[in-house]
Every structure is written in structure tokens, then in C-alpha cells.
Amino acid sequence: MSRRQTKDQTVVIIGMGDTGVLVATRLSRYFNVIGISTKPNLVSGQELGKRLADLSWWNRYYNTPLRGFKALADVEIHHAKAECVDLATKTVLVVDQSNDETLIPFDFLVIASGTSNGFWRDDHLRSEAQIDERLEQDAATIRDANTVAIVGGGPCGVSCALNIRRAYPEKMVSLYTSGDLPLPGYHDEARQYYHRELTAEGVQIFSGHRAITEEPSPSAGTIRFESGQSAVADAIIWSTGNRKPHTRFLPDALLDDEGFVKTKNTLEVV
């Protein structure tokens, strides 16, 4: 298909995070691409530990205005939230911060709206100033805390524990993991290595502590464990892998029981 032919077709991408931006930069060479983003920046979900412990560094590399990407120059970006997808008419209804509605037609739809995961990823409609305010609030929570608890021993939890302890050696940083060692599923040498690193940095590791998750998860106060034990901290970081998909705008027929999009192995919608 020629470039001119494909440019007559429109691809709408819902979600301009890491995946949405990457897809948009590739497809804009051949299609009219419209991106829908709840934030005017690419606010990456990567490196939470550095974000909390060294926000100025993190902002330089992981908080980038979408208008700053040259490869998105041909992409029409709507700072809005998707409210409804109508598959019959091939349209997406979006609402911006002024509560103005826009109906956007598409030939192809890419769903890259992501998930909520802990307190640092959400689908709230925010301006650049509101993004900066939220990032600073999260960093200040850690900065002002005397005791920090990280629940979950995966890569995110380990990164948070190490970065926070290195930035604030005076703080008591505790890592709670359900297994014997952090990083379940990783090579045993890697698990042993990071266990030694955490210990050397002064992180208190509590193995065999599976937390009882609450809704909403507390950001401070008491953590309760299945064993009946409990712990108290000034700041709590939940990195247990619980995710909530941002898919309320999609027809129920496209979703599984947990709200995730049902797809084939090719990531096409079933």
C-alpha cells in the first residue's frame, strides 16, 4: 500500500505513555495518527525508586513534554480522557479539562491506556503544573518520613529500597517480601546479590511477610500481614504488582472479568 493511500486512514491511539508514544512515532510515517493522552507529558512508569529519591534527576530523563518529541511532530495530540468507544461508528468520545467533548473518528484503534499500579500510575487528567505538583508531593512524602516501608520484593520494591536508603541513610527503610529472598523468578545469583546489596545498605529485610492488601491501600500507618503480624511506617510504598486496567471507556464485550482487554497472541482484540 502506498504512502498516500495509507495517509488517508486514521489511527487513534488511546494512551501516550511509553507504548503509545513508540507506536505513534512509527505509524505516523504511514497514517494520520491521533493520540489521546490524559497528560501533556510522557510521564514514565519506570525508575520509581529514583523518582522518589532523586526527583530532579528523574525529571530530566523520564518526564518529557510530548511536544518535545520531534518524531511526534505529525501526530495530532488531544490532552483529554477517553470516555467511550463506539465500535459501530468507529468513534471515540473524549473529554478535556474544560469538560468539552470531542468525537474523534478512526479507521484503526490502538489501546495503550495502561494500568494503575501503586500510587504513581493513574489515568487522572492532569496539566503540566498538576503533574509537577503530584511528583513533588510523592517525593516530599519520602523526604519527610522517618520510616519507610516497601511492600513487595520484585524489581520495583528492590529499586525503591536501595535508592531511598542510599539517598537518605538516616531513615529506617524496610522491605517486606513474601518469599525467602527478593526478586522471585530471577536467577538465584541475582537474588543473592541484591539481598547482599540491600543488607549492606542497611535496608531491613522481612522475609515471609505477605501483606493483606486493602482498598484503598494506605500510604502511611499500619500494614497487616497474613501471619497476623503488623508493621507501622510513616510512608508505605506498595509494589505488590496489583494492577487495575484503564479500560472503562471500552465496551464490556472486549474485556475479561478483571477488565483487561481480551486479545489474540498477536495483540489484536478478540
What do the predicted segments below correspond to?
Residues 2-76, 162-188:
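Beta1-alpha1 glycine-rich phosphate/pyrophosphate-binding loop at the start
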Residues 6-30, 118-120, 133-177, 246, ...:
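Rossmann-like dinucleotide/flavin-binding elements
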Residues 79-90, 207-220:
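A conserved short coil-to-beta-strand element within the FAD-binding core of flavoproteins
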Residues 11, 19, 38-57, 109-114, ...:
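Conserved N-terminal glycine/acidic-rich loop preference
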Residues 32-35, 74, 125-130, 174-175, ...:
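Preference for well-ordered, secondary-structure-rich cores of eukaryotic proteins
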Residues 94-100, 224-227, 265:
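Short acidic, glycine-rich loop/turn motifs
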Residues 128-146, 231-270:
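FAD-site-proximal beta/loop scaffold in flavoenzymes
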Residues 1-10, 72-149, 237-239:
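FAD-binding core/adjacent interface of flavoenzyme oxidoreductases
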